[in-house]
UniProtKB/Swiss-Prot annotation:
PROSITE patterns: G_PROTEIN_RECEP_F1_1, G_PROTEIN_RECEP_F1_2. Residues 272-301 are annotated as: Disordered. The PDZ domain-binding motif is involved in the interaction with MPDZ. The chain crosses the membrane at residues 56-80, 87-111, 129-151, 168-189, 214-236, 312-336, 348-370. Keywords: Behavior, Cell membrane, Disulfide bond, G-protein coupled receptor, Glycoprotein, Membrane, Receptor, Signal, Transducer, Transmembrane, Transmembrane helix. SMART domains: 7TM_GPCR_Srsx. It comes from Canis lupus familiaris. One of its GO terms (cellular component) is plasma membrane. SUPFAM superfamilies: Family A G protein-coupled receptor-like. Disulfide bonds join 127-207, 337-341. This is 5-hydroxytryptamine receptor 2C. A motif (NPxxY motif) lies at residues 364-368.
């Protein structure tokens, strides 16, 4: 406890000296802190360099804080907001967990390497572990986006079949598969690095993956193949949505089977009852015929919801593509061209491009905030320390209606409506009749629209 107190005191002294621009500090605050705690000697393996070389890089701490905080807000929103409880948002929450771990475990160590001019300042056995975590979370990000793209395409293409396998448990199983693939890609790195340090060190000082075969195979498995699948399925999703919208606009959509009691007569004569029902396939009422010809509002609204959600996810895909492609393309070129390329230039480009990729982990919450009202409202509440979900207004339900169907009365009940309110039409009240209880009726307009609306709450 005494050693820890001395270490903290030493760290604060050096930090205050830095803030007042006393540049004669020979040992960095972080180096002094860790050195005092572990009390390492010059002959040990754990030895810091002489001092920090790049103090302006500390400004990157702002990016790290925003990345961690933004993704925590996403995780809280999906956990607390019932409107966000669907398969796509579960994937987005898992993606936010991966991005948050990038900010917690990967970006700080990368910043530390920059501060020491890319000379690894920590124990050498931590280098392959850090590279493995970097590959794990980067692979998890692209795999999540690929899985989201596939899941949404299947949901829009075959909504009924997808709804049978779209429970919360099935979504968790899909997410577990994504993480299993990501772990499988990253696990070989510490094994390779601990066996041969040359595979994870360049010039015996810089911690970077130095195995050409693994770089090539890993780049294709973890990035280019999932990226190709993601782009193809996203384009197919947009194509299906456009085709469905055009079919609705031109009236070439098949109406679902429905129950339509067009004409119901209840007669009571001399103790006998007769029921006559008109042919449901014939409709002589012109107003009713016009209503039939209208397009289903639920289906069109569902397609609009899907298109809005696809735009948001499309922006996420595009940002990921733009911010990670430079790194992976440069990584492949540095291996393929070998000594023919300027390796120092390649290293500098990779150092810049990898941080552009890291920034992508902090941009996704910003995309959700700008383009989704539910996320925006949730983030605003959480920043004001309001963690309770908003109470929904009471739902207006139709009371039970007691209708007396007189003898000879014409009771017209139309069940196929876009609301839950049955429609009772004219009656002849000259003769006594029977009493009917009309309950609340809830019939879906279109099964595909119901499924689609449940999916597209992004």
């Amino acid at each position: 406890m005494v050693n820890l107190r001395k270490a903290v005191h030493s760290f604060l002294v050096h930090l205050i000296g830095l803030l007042v621009w006393q540049c004669d500090i020979s040992v960095s605050p972080v180096a002094a802190l860790v050195t005092d705690i572990f009390n390492t000697s010059d002959g040990g393996r754990f030895k810091f360099p002489d001092g920090v070389q790049n103090w302006p890089a500390l400004s990157i701490v702002i990016i790290i804080i925003l990345t961690i905080g933004g993704n925590i807000l996403v995780i809280m929103a999906v956990s607390l907001e019932k409107k966000l409880h669907n398969a796509t948002n579960y994937f987005l929450m898992s993606l936010a967990i991966a991005d948050m771990l990038v900010g917690l475990l990967v970006m700080p160590l990368s910043l530390l390497a920059i501060l020491y001019d890319y000379v690894w300042p920590l124990p050498r056995y931590l280098c392959p572990v850090w590279i493995s975590l970097d590959v794990l979370f980067s692979t998890a990000s692209i795999m999540h986006l690929c899985a989201i793209s596939l899941d949404r395409y299947v949901a829009i293409r075959n909504p009924v079949e997808h709804s049978r396998f779209n429970s919360r448990t099935k979504a968790i199983m899909k997410i577990a598969i994504v993480w299993a693939i990501s772990i499988g890609v990253s696990v070989p790195i510490p094994v390779i690095g601990l066996r041969d340090e040359e595979k994870v060190f360049v010039n015996n000082t810089t911690c970077v993956l130095n195995d050409p075969n693994f770089v090539l195979i890993g780049s294709f498995v973890a990035f280019f193949i999932p990226l190709t699948i993601m782009v193809i399925t996203y384009c197919l999703t947009i194509h299906v949505l456009r085709r469905q919208a055009l079919m609705l606009l031109h009236g070439h959509v098949e109406e679902p089977p429905r129950i339509n009691l067009d004409f119901l007569k209840c007669c009571r004569r001399n103790g006998t009852e007769e029921e006559n029902s008109a042919n449901p396939n014939q409709d002589s009422n012109p107003r009713r015929r016009k209503k039939k010809e209208r397009r289903p509002r639920g289906t069109m609204q569902a397609i609009n919801n899907e298109r809005k959600a696809s735009k948001v996810l499309g922006i996420v895909f595009f940002v990921f593509l733009v911010m990670w492609c430079p790194f992976f393309i440069t990584n492949i070129l540095s291996v393929l061209c070998g000594k023919a390329c300027n390796q120092k230039l390649m290293e500098k480009l990779l150092n810049v491009f990898v941080w552009i990729g890291y920034v992508c982990s902090g941009i996704n919450p910003l995309v959700y905030t700008l383009f989704n009202k539910i996320y925006r409202r949730a983030f605003s509440n959480y920043l004001r320390c309001n963690y309770k979900p908003e109470k929904k207004p009471p739902v207006r339900q139709m009371p039970r209606v007691a209708a007396t169907a007189l003898s000879g009365r014409e009771l017209n009940v139309n069940i196929y409506r876009h609301t839950n309110e049955p429609v009772l039409k004219k009656a002849n009240d000259k003769e006594p009749g029977i009493e009917m209880q009309v309950e609340n009726l809830e019939l879906p307009v279109n099964p595909s629209s119901v499924v689609s609306e449940r999916i597209s709450s992004v």
